[in-house]
Amino acid sequence: LGGETAEMAGFYASGDYDVAGFAVGIVDRKNLITGEKITAGDVILGLPSTGIHSNGYSLVRRIISDNHLTLKETYEGFDKPLGEVVLTPTKLYPKLVLPVLKGADVKGLVHITGGGFYDNIPRILPEGTRAVLDADKWPLLPIFSFIKVQGGVEPREMYRTFNCGLGMLLILSRGEAEKAKKILKNIGEAVYEVGTISEGNRDVIVTGGLFHE
């Protein structure tokens, strides 16, 4: 079992309090996806996010405050006001992932939440492997370029803090990855082949994307 309490520095005033909820999941031990079967040559598929999801808001609020940005203004690159962009609801993935689990052998699943790519992916990697991602392989949502420029955030820190356009990663062998792509296409979900597993030391390499800017 695991859990956390969100750190919301500068958000709560004296006398405020937080009401939190939780969910408990159950899985048969034989169906656990532990990542232990991941090997060099496996493929990494990515499912798109809808925005910043539920992580990085303290940094976003600081950038908005420091740059005197207006939540009601529609800035260049957006089709709606900034306030609506940052509050875009978090995408949920169970209805997309469950059909894949039934039709393909998924070796690893990674939810890109707090800690981004660099902290979340190693949790599923076995010893002797490395995840190599090409950020040019998936669309970068405008909000992430906006945050990087307005906040002067280094690319590596962006990929450590935010999902940068991908909310869920699936790791499969080449043949099983093709099955997964077909399943996701049939249910109308976009999916991108964003990287591979190579030999390494349970680390992550990201190239392209925000590193170009």
Name these PLM-found stretches.
Residues 38-84:
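Acidic, glycine-rich loop-and-beta core segments that form the ion-binding/anion-interacting portion
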Residues 12-17, 71, 76-87, 91-213:
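Glycine-/charge-enriched secondary-structure boundary and capping motifs
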